């Protein structure tokens, strides 16, 4: 938790940052992600909360959100990451580096959606970050720094996952109702967070 507080100061770390870092790290020995696998995982994720219009309603704390999170966790573990849920309900995957005392490289995004949302906002950043880790594992390439993949919870409902890591949540914010009908407090507990330990996120 503490190490993330020092490294993450934005609401969501987008795919473009992941691609930029990846291109720099492997400029002299380029690795290639598996495009087919990436698209397959994006398609599979889009099934959770899929609506009749071709989009998705995977609002935070809903059953569809929980299923999508389980799917993402499965992919992260397959990619060789040590995965846990922080007290704020964010999914954290860690791929060890050669020197884990070095500051981590953090990438990721979110997978919750607005009601009647699209299939790519947030999803691309999250699934692409996992694909980066999978590519590193398959290539047997270990970074000097640890790599952290973060999937922030409830980004669409008010950036609550990233707020937990930066400024924290007030009692008033914890009682706000989300689009799924759960309060933020109940929602965080529903996805495996721990309200009493938020300061450790």
Label the model's feature ranges.
Residues 50-96:
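A non-catalytic alpha/beta surface segment that caps or lines the substrate-entry region
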Residues 78-79, 91-124, 129:
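Catalytic-core environment of secreted peptidases
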Residues 83-87, 107-109, 149-151:
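General beta-strand structural signal in soluble alpha/beta enzymes
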Residues 19-27:
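Hydrophobic h-region of N-terminal signal peptides that target proteins for export
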Residues 10-18:
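Sec-dependent signal peptide recognition
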Residues 1-10:
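N-terminal secretory signal peptides that target proteins for export/translocation
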Residues 114, 123-201:
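Acidic/histidine-rich catalytic neighborhood of metal-dependent amide-processing enzymes
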Residues 27-56, 96:
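N-terminal hydrophobic or amphipathic helices/low-complexity stretches enriched
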């Amino acid at each position: 938790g503490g190490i993330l507080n020092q490294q993450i100061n934005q609401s969501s770390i987008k795919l473009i940052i992941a691609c930029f870092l990846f291109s720099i790290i492997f400029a002299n020995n380029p690795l290639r992600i598996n495009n087919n696998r990436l698209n397959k995982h994006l398609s599979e994720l889009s099934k959770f909360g899929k609506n009749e219009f071709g989009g998705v309603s995977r609002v935070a704390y809903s059953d569809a959100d929980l299923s999508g999170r389980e799917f993402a966790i499965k992919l992260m573990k397959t990619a060789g990451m040590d995965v846990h849920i922080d007290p704020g309900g964010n999914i954290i995957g860690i791929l060890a580096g050669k020197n884990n005392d070095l500051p981590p490289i953090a990438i990721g995004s979110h997978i919750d959606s607005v009601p009647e949302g699209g299939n790519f906002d947030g999803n691309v950043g999250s699934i692409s970050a996992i694909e980066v880790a999978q590519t590193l594992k398959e290539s047997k390439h270990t970074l000097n720094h640890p790599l952290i993949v973060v999937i922030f919870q409830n980004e669409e409902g008010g950036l609550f996952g990233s707020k937990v890591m930066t400024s924290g949540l007030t009692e008033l914010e914890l009682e706000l109702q989300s689009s799924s009908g759960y309060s933020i407090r109940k929602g965080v507990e529903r996805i495996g967070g721990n309200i009493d330990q938020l300061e450790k996120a």
